[in-house]
């Protein structure tokens, strides 16, 4: 979550 890369957050958004 905190250490997760920006790609992860980007995917969430997309979802």
Swiss-Prot record:
Subunit structure and binding partners: Monomer.
The UniProt record lists the keyword Glycoprotein: yes
EC number: 3.2.1.117
Entry protein name: Amygdalin beta-glucosidase I'
Keywords recorded for this protein, A-Z: Glycoprotein, Glycosidase, Hydrolase
Catalyzed reactions per annotation: (R)-amygdalin + H2O = (R)-prunasin + D-glucose
Modification after translation: Glycosylated.
Source organism of this protein record: Prunus serotina
GO molecular function, one term: amygdalin beta-glucosidase activity
Keyword Transcription regulation: no
